Amino acid sequence: MTTHRPDTPLPHIEFDGRPATEEDLRIPVLYGYGHFTALQVRDGRVRGLGLHLARLDAANRELFDLPLDGDRVRELIRHALDGAGLRDASVRVNGYLPPGASRTTLMVTVREPAARPAGARALMSVPYARTAPHIKRPGEFGQTYYGILAGRAGFDEALLTAPGGVVTEGAITNIGFWDGGSVVWPDAPALAGITMTLLEQELERAGRPSERRPVTLEGPDGVGRYPAAFVCNSQGLAPVRRIDDTAFAVDDELMRELGAVYDGAPQNTV
């Protein structure tokens, strides 16, 4: 249940377990080098919590050569949720290492819970590949830039592609395709989203394993060979109705099945 305290403005931001000060907020402004994860909390629980903690720890080790204790992260999330007076929320955990610091500074941001995506999505392909795409990090100018251009052109999101029209990922989502028998993920450098990973795990558990294959905009591996497609992120799943001029059928039965698979993934108390 959401019981936001009216005297606590949202977003509610804490740094290392205390309300953000002006000095704290200079950290993300002046030292953008960092990483984050975004999650949806419902009744104090999170799907894939262990995956989020592992993501933060792996990125922290790679960027700062420091481990990140999962119990500390959970404690800070709980503290920020209590501070905001919410048990249903959108939560973002950012990790930074300001100059001279020996311990990672954690910024926890709490907002109202996000609604699941509504309606089928139209994607505009763009020639953009992220550096170190396996790390989820703030300040992605290219993704934001192309996302805005896609919106101006009447699309819902940008679809990132590598040289040769190789499909990698959505600007803020992972993309999956349906070949009539199984889910296919692009075999290309991309962020392994938590929702995508949960779907992979749960489909495998259900005896319907997904696959990785090269996917391109055109040619024998082109998107047009697939009857349906979908995107997913921490907010949920949504069907794709077109990529550029290639139309896809909205397979309601497929989306119900995938939604049920995702909803069946275990939830963990923060």
Predicted regions: what they are:
Residues 86-95:
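Ordered, amphipathic secondary-structure segments that act as subunit-interaction surfaces
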Residues 80-85:
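Phosphate/pyrophosphate-binding loops at sites that engage ATP/ADP/AMP, CoA/4′-phosphopantetheine
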Residues 1-79, 96, 101-270:
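Helix-start/capping segments and mature chain N-termini
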